[in-house]
Amino acid sequence: MSHRDTLFSAPIARLGDWTFDERVAEVFPDMIQRSVPGYSNIISMIGMLAERFVQPGTQVYDLGCSLGAATLSVRRNIHHDNCKIIAIDNSPAMIERCSRHIDAYKAPTPVDVIEGDIRDIAIENASMVVLNFTLQFLEPSERQALLDKIYQGLNPGGALVLSEKFSFEDAKVGELLFNMHHDFKRANGYSELEISQKRSMLENVMLTDSVETHKARLHKAGFEHSELWFQCFNFGSLVALKAEDAA
């Protein structure tokens, strides 16, 4: 059962850095729906992409799986035999709830739910990899290495879905979309205090990049094709494709 997010409705004397702890995990479904514009669309479309890209006898990786929404969307759209999904997150609270969610929905495709660091897991025989609002929580200096590893672990013709909050090289556009996102949160019932306190906790741990920076990293990793396929305000998702004739 999901609870309503009221974590920041009262003043907090000492705001530390953001963590995905038990309190956040408990309200996460409500929090993300009210905070991330287009989240439900992205989750649904990840399933549609899975239907196109997941191949028989291959693996799908959900890196930073949180409560398993993307994993479940992928699994509902796998219609091949001998596939497996590996869902990994470093938050014990998220993983505990993710396991319960996965177990509640029976399907032929097995899911390995792993508590661990996405930087340490091997990517092998992958037809699809999902990074759904995960890369932005890694140190910027570590992001290229992860994308390189993903590219190497993808089979030819495989796909990476990379969803992120974006910054913008055009400051005027960035300011507009930032303000529209805050309007979105206000419309969903968040107060100015809640918005301000959450932003203060996130500012040191969620470091955003521009779409151009993401595309440059993907190209450097070896992806022959990448494009923004979804955007709402300063949130969006890219798909990057490994060529079918890649070595």
From Swiss-Prot:
Biological process according to GO: tRNA wobble uridine modification
EC id: 2.1.3.-
GO molecular function: carboxyl- or carbamoyltransferase activity; S-adenosyl-L-methionine binding
Reactions mediated catalytically: prephenate + S-adenosyl-L-methionine = carboxy-S-adenosyl-L-methionine + 3-phenylpyruvate + H2O
CDD domains documented for this protein: AdoMet_MTases
One Pfam family of this chain: Methyltransf_25
UniProt enzyme class: transferase
Domain of life where this protein originates: Bacteria
Binding site for S-adenosyl-L-methionine: Y39, G64, C65, S66, D89, N90, D117, I118, N132, R199
Keyword S-adenosyl-L-methionine: yes
InterPro entries for this protein: CmoA (IPR005271), Methyltransf_25 (IPR041698), SAM-dependent_MTases_sf (IPR029063)
SUPFAM superfamilies, alphabetized: S-adenosyl-L-methionine-dependent methyltransferases
Annotated function: Catalyzes the conversion of S-adenosyl-L-methionine (SAM) to carboxy-S-adenosyl-L-methionine (Cx-SAM).
Subunit structure: Homodimer.
Family: Belongs to the class I-like SAM-binding methyltransferase superfamily. Cx-SAM synthase family.
HAMAP family membership: Cx_SAM_synthase
UniProt-recorded name of the protein: Carboxy-S-adenosyl-L-methionine synthase
Organism: Shigella sonnei (strain Ss046)
UniProt lineage: Bacteria, Pseudomonadati, Pseudomonadota, Gammaproteobacteria, Enterobacterales
